[in-house]
């Protein structure tokens, strides 16, 4: 059994909150630069130039990439041989979010109740997904998720007979419906399988995969490529001004499901596809 101090979790989460909001991951920056190089439309080129300049300024001045510093979405992989000492793991994560958003002067966007709408004033609670795994390490992935892209998510319970074609049609429908609202170029997370609640989590988890890393299953990797081509053929373009770069990547995560089910969920990230990871 390995012991990890709750205060170390808090410290790591606080640091990730600030870094994720101010420094875009290298893989995302590389995709944006590649899109700028390949984009023939002058307005789209200028839009991508502005996006890349914003990325540079945010990193240099350590200021947020976007005014919407998001909900703190956290994925936790807790080793079976790990003991958290000095407090609960969830409380340690929330305290890290509280400190990170306060010390980093990041906008607090969480309301305590969806209808009463009173701001919690510290961006807690974090939205945490726990997964117990083998081993003696603790992995934490933090992804600040803004509302502009989150509000464009869609979920549908397809019929098994709808098959691959039905999945493609639904994903394209979701992206077409989103239009410029999620601040393209976007990253599209697609969950397939499980049940109503699990498929949405799959779609969100797909968004934290490195953009250069396709699905390990060749069948789904090919489907990711087909969907990316189809989405970019829509012509929405950067910021919705037109162009060939509507999406930077499509990521699919799949899991077993019931013989009578074919759940599909789409979760979209804007071009500020923020996330950080730490292993303790």
Protein language model features and the residues they cover:
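Non-transmembrane, aqueous-exposed alpha-helical and coiled segments at domain scale
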Residues: 1-280
């Amino acid at each position: 059994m390995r012991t990890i101090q709750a205060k170390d979790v808090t410290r790591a989460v606080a640091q990730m909150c600030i870094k994720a909001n101010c420094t875009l991951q290298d893989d995302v920056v590389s995709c944006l630069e590649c899109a700028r190089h390949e984009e023939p439309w002058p307005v789209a080129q200028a839009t991508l130039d502005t996006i890349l300049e914003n990325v540079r300024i945010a990193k240099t001045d350590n200021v947020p990439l976007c005014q919407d510093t998001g909900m703190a979405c956290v994925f936790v992989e807790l080793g079976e041989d790990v003991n958290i000492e000095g407090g609960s793991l969830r409380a340690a994560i929330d305290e890290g979010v509280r400190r990170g958003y306060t010390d980093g002067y990041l906008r607090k966007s969480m309301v305590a109740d969806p209808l009463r709408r009173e701001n919690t004033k510290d961006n807690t609670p974090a939205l945490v997904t726990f997964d117990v795994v083998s081993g003696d390490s603790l992995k934490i992935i933090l992804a600040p998720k803004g509302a502009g892209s989150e509000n464009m998510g869609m979920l549908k319970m397809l019929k098994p007979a709808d098959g691959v074609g039905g999945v493609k049609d639904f994903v394209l429908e979701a992206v077409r419906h989103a239009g410029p609202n999620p601040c393209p170029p976007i990253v599209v997370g697609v969950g397939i399988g499980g049940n109503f609640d699990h498929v949405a989590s799959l779609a969100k988890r797909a968004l934290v995969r490195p953009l250069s890393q396709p699905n390990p299953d060749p069948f789904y990797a090919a489907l990711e490529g087909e969907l990316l081509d189809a989405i970019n053929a829509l012509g929405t373009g950067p910021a919705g001004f037109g162009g060939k770069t509507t999406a930077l990547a499509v990521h699919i995560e799949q899991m077993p499901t019931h013989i009578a089910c074919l759940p599909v969920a789409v979760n979209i990230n804007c071009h500020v596809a923020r996330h950080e990871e730490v292993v303790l």
